[in-house]
């Protein structure tokens, strides 16, 4: 069974990342590698995590012309990762190209999910980029586009999970960032929830980064989260 907890390795150096990884159990959590760490350490770091038998979510949010995104997704799959993502706003053709690029992997292909609306966005900010929808409307619209393209699910705030599940089906995966512990500040995330709240809303996987990586004892935080989940 795949763990619900995805620990975001939000570090700016390899030593700190490895120190935490060595304390984690691949049976208890998956790991997320984002743009910062991937740019710093590259594919070999991802492969090293896979060799440790961790499920790796490669969070690079591909968004480009369809051919480029398809090739990027194929390259990501070559690393043996469990999950990759693209920006849903890239459109139906881009999403379909990403999906098609993974067909050769059959049942061993990574999960392909689409980013809807970043959890740093606040209500009203979409207008600044020319979108008149509300946050829930836009997230739901993009989730339905991802489902039409044949993707496995989406990244979305927990606030939109219920409506996405209603529109796209209970088996449509929802991966939820913006998870904060009750005593944490929101920092640059606007639409946040606690782990327990997100699970109640129906989130399938919770991405938790800074509450873990910035803690004085990250492993204690992980252990407490696992007990709660």
Curated annotation (Swiss-Prot):
Keywords: Decarboxylase, Lyase, Pyrimidine biosynthesis. NCBIfam families: PRK00230.1, pyrF. The lineage of its organism: Bacteria, Pseudomonadati, Pseudomonadota, Gammaproteobacteria, Legionellales. It is an enzyme of class 4 (lyase). The keyword Zinc does not apply. The gene is pyrF. The keyword Lyase applies. The active site is at 61 (proton donor). Its EC number is 4.1.1.23. Pathway: Pyrimidine metabolism; UMP biosynthesis via de novo pathway; UMP from orotate: step 2/2. It holds the Pfam family OMPdecase. Catalyzes the decarboxylation of orotidine 5'-monophosphate (OMP) to uridine 5'-monophosphate (UMP). One of its GO terms (molecular function) is orotidine-5'-phosphate decarboxylase activity. One of its GO terms (biological process) is 'de novo' UMP biosynthetic process. InterPro entries: Aldolase_TIM, OMPdecase, OMPdecase_AS, OMPdecase_bac, OMPdeCOase_dom, RibuloseP-bd_barrel. This is Orotidine 5'-phosphate decarboxylase.
